[in-house]
Amino acid sequence: MTQVVIGQNEAIESALRRFKRQVAKAGIYADIKKNQFFETPEEKRKRKAIARRRQRSRRR
């Protein structure tokens, strides 16, 4: 869980910016986007196979 403690003289905008940075760093956006729709086991296999191929081509 990402939390931001706001300082006494801190502006809300800067606290919000800090919160957004922490959420992005934790990978929460990517996780939400990934789990937005149900993915069948076949789709998972295909996605992982494509990722493997992409990794192999990057190594060369």
From Swiss-Prot:
One GO CC term on file: ribosome
**Where are the bilayer-spanning segments?**
none
- Composition bias, kind Basic residues: at what positions? 45-60
* One of the protein's GO biological processes: translation
Swiss-Prot/TrEMBL keywords: Ribonucleoprotein, Ribosomal protein
Q: Which GO terms describe its molecular function?
A: structural constituent of ribosome
Q: Where is this region: Disordered?
A: 41-60
Show the Pfam families listed in the entry. Answer: Ribosomal_S21
Keyword Chloroplast assigned:
no
Q: Sorted alphabetically, which NCBIfam families does this protein's record hold?
A: S21p (TIGR00030)
**Cross-referenced HAMAP family, in alphabetical order?**
Ribosomal_bS21
* Family listed: Belongs to the bacterial ribosomal protein bS21 family.
Q: What is this protein called?
A: Small ribosomal subunit protein bS21
